[in-house]
Amino acid sequence: MEVMDHHHHTSSTRPNPTTRRMNFFLPNAIHMDSHLLYYRPQPGYGAPPPQGGYGYPQPPPPQQPYGYSQPPPQQYGGYNGVPPNAPQYGRPGMPSVNSNAYINGNQNAPPPPPQGMHSFGQGAPQNYAFQYSNCTGRRKALLIGINYFGQRGQLRGCINDVKNMSSYLHENFGYQRDDMVILTDDQQNPMSQPTKQNILRAMHWLVKDARPNDSLFFHYSGHGGQTKDLDGDEEDGYDEVIYPVDFRQVGHIVDDEMHRIMVQPLQPGVRLTAIFDSCHSGTALDLPYVYSTQGVLKEPNLAKEAGQGLLGVISSYSQGDMSGVASNLMGFFKKATTGDDAYNKTLATKTSPADVVMWSGSKDDQTSADATIAAQATGAMSWAFITAMKKNPQQSYVQLLNSIRDELATKYTQKPQLSCSHPLSMVPPLLL
């Protein structure tokens, strides 16, 4: 069994983390949370994990949600294609974090993001580019927290993570409650339960009708794991997955599907910020550029992808040339069937003309932690992100990455990881 080594502090000022997720190896190359999965929907995936769980008695779900006003998701209108009434972003008299302090004379604040289209860099075709979002448009958020009440591997902090994150977005970045879909397993409305069907439907709602300079926010706190990679796009041979509350009946959600739903449809200049507080979440959105506080961990070979014709698909899409998309795809799949080694796994590029940024609290070979902080169960990444942002909301990507690392280092052995759909400029501020 492979278990992450968390430091256990005895000081009253520090939490005593418990391992939120543990990894063990099963036949057929499945890695998952040992406390969670005592059986799978499909037979034959190995023996059950140890009995007992975490040792924290968990009361049944309360009869009412947390107490903040939350209409059920089906009332948002987004699922049926009818957008809610346009909200007033920000409260009167309250400056938004996005009213950039650099423009207002604070030279210590990072400058605003560069405008226009930007090249992916060396090896990319000339017309292949992406665009940053200035986050001045519409805001929508999808927040998912699953404690798995009554199931083996029950967690304590995931619903608290969502409550804290939604309040932070609302109070500091002008996200309106009516533009948030919150799926947690303490809610009585079946449409607000984090089932696989509801999660997938909400992912489609999140990105529907997104326009340049819109800001979309996705937050997942719950169990994560790995499964055998079937399409050859993962270096370690495994796809990352998340587990809906009903995964035992209907299965998990794979990173390839999350990328297809939430990343591929986005136009240039649309921001999607994602936070995953789960194990094996480092590449949960299948983004091609991965950074740590030590530097670049992973980046695509654009020259190779361009030579294979992969980048033509997305450049045609970003220019609205759907016929170009079709012809590029046909040419790609034709080459893929010729036996050419370059196409033997039918790989598609994971870059995007949009502005997609993902924060995760662990590398794919680490676990995440479920700890008690200020007498409240919470996930490490969710807590560290909010704590670091509250201390200094005007940070660049690299500053925030280091700030989150410093927060985590006080209580955890985890390291933060930042993944992007495009090469990361360390200069632009993090806008939400």
From Swiss-Prot:
Superkingdom as given in the UniProt entry: Eukaryota
Compositionally biased tracts (Basic residues): 1-11
This protein's record includes keyword Protease: yes
GO cellular component: cytoplasm
Compositional bias segments (type: Pro residues): 46-74
Keyword RNA-binding (UniProt): no
Regions of compositional bias (Low complexity) in chain numbering: 12-21
InterPro entries, alphabetized: Caspase-like_dom_sf, Metacaspase, Pept_C14_caspase
GO terms, biological process: apoptotic process; proteolysis
Active site: H223, C279
E.C. code: 3.4.22.-
Family note: Belongs to the peptidase C14B family.
Function text: Involved in cell death (apoptosis).
Protein name: Metacaspase-1
Species of the source: Sclerotinia sclerotiorum (strain ATCC 18683 / 1980 / Ss-1)
